[in-house]
Amino acid sequence: LPESELDIMLVLWNNTPPMNRMEIEKVINTKKSLAPTTILSLLARLEAKNFVEVTKQGKMNLYTPLVSQSDYQAHESQSVLEKLYGNSLKKFVTSLYQGKKVSPEEIQDLSDFLKELEDREK
């Protein structure tokens, strides 16, 4: 998703849906200023992409996410891994920590994760 559409989805994921346009606008405008018409255009695009469902309540449209944040994250992560790192998890992790100090806790977390993957493969 483009950044502006992702911003709208983050509002929906991080709040209790369904939300109307004014509620979305109130949250999003704490970070950046978007006109109501821009928000409506972004919501229409998200509906066309089947990311949100629109239901009517009187004269008001309510927006509910159809794609969960975890599903989106998994899809995007896999896409980045494939396109930028040739499906190499090692290259991906190396690029994340290149030149940065890694805490013992992070090393342990990675080690535990790899052990879990190894156990699943058995």
Residue spans of the language-model regions?
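Short, cationic-aromatic polyanion-contact patches
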Residues: 1-4, 57-76
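Glycine-centered, phosphate/nucleic-acid-interacting loop/turn motifs that mediate DNA/RNA or nucleotide
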Residues: 50
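C-terminal regulatory/oligomerization modules of transcriptional regulators
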Residues: 94, 98-122
